[in-house]
């Protein structure tokens, strides 16, 4: 009997697929947020993260949107002027297409992770041409495959003015905003076009937020095709209470939608994650939430335990709090 039982067990094991992944959470937060009328609850990935079947399993089970963490930024896509590399971005887009996930493209124009050749441009016409050509090629390559683009990323200083250490501001002044958005609209007419920025929800950044609101209202009134504003929402514990008011102020600028785009909260307090989730639910123009990573071990704030899943890909109390907030 013992021998035959062993044979039976062995035959069952042999018949099982080689790569069964456990369900890391009891409910999909993407499914729950869509039931509330929102478009997605998302996360990030990139070619290095796609190597992890555990990471992929969590994304497929629990999320509905992905943002490429680095593979669509300027240094990755056009490291040398006029020479483009879409390999990393293609991997993310293909993974998304295979699994029914929306993609937020990130980021077409950003002063950081920028090749030196762009920093070296001092002539207005050359800078305008560089922006237009970059966006034409990158957004054009992914045309029809990306739900939304962060066209401009982190363009404001703490005083609400345009960032002074940006080569785009230094060479073109405010003109680069219209140049970038019009190029993006031409390259992919159906993608939602965003300004994405930091600390909008920080009570200590009132000038930054006021400056952004005033600038975006002006740009929208000028016909610049800005569809949305993204709030990165990198928070410390206890700082979630300002998120809803920030989203409401962003929504008041005349844009069609707003989103939480890079959410993480140091130490991942469950109550704070619930507060942020409810903030999006309470603002009609908020279309979704993206957390900036799956597992704590892969977070840019990895020592802070800021995400919804721990280093073993197990759902944390913060995940349960999000589920409860969405019920």
From Swiss-Prot:
Report the active site residues.
154 (proton donor), 262 (nucleophile)
Q: Which InterPro entries match?
A: GH10, GH10_dom, Glycoside_hydrolase_SF
Q: How does activity depend on pH?
A: Optimum pH is 5.0-7.0.
Any one GO BP annotation for this protein: xylan catabolic process
Q: What's the EC number here?
A: 3.2.1.8
Tell me yes or no: is Hydrolase among this UniProt entry's keywords.
yes
Task: Please list which residues make up the signal peptide.
Answer: 1-15
Q: Which Pfam families match?
A: Glyco_hydro_10
Superkingdom of the source? Eukaryota
Report the activity regulation comment. Weakly inhibited by the wheat xylanase inhibiting protein I (XIP-I).
Q: Which reaction does it catalyse?
A: Endohydrolysis of (1->4)-beta-D-xylosidic linkages in xylans
Q: Which UniProt keywords apply?
A: Carbohydrate metabolism, Disulfide bond, Glycosidase, Hydrolase, Polysaccharide degradation, Secreted, Signal, Virulence, Xylan degradation
Q: In which pathway does it act?
A: Glycan degradation; xylan degradation
Q: Under the GO molecular function aspect, what terms does this record hold?
A: endo-1,4-beta-xylanase activity
Q: Gene3D superfamilies attached here?
A: Glycosidases
Q: What does this protein do?
A: Endo-1,4-beta-xylanase involved in the hydrolysis of xylan, a major structural heterogeneous polysaccharide found in plant biomass representing the second most abundant polysaccharide in the biosphere, after cellulose. Plays an important role in causing fusarium head blight (FHB) on cereal crops.
Indicate the family of this protein. Belongs to the glycosyl hydrolase 10 (cellulase F) family.
For this entry, the protein name equals: Endo-1,4-beta-xylanase C
Natural source organism: Gibberella zeae (strain ATCC MYA-4620 / CBS 123657 / FGSC 9075 / NRRL 31084 / PH-1)
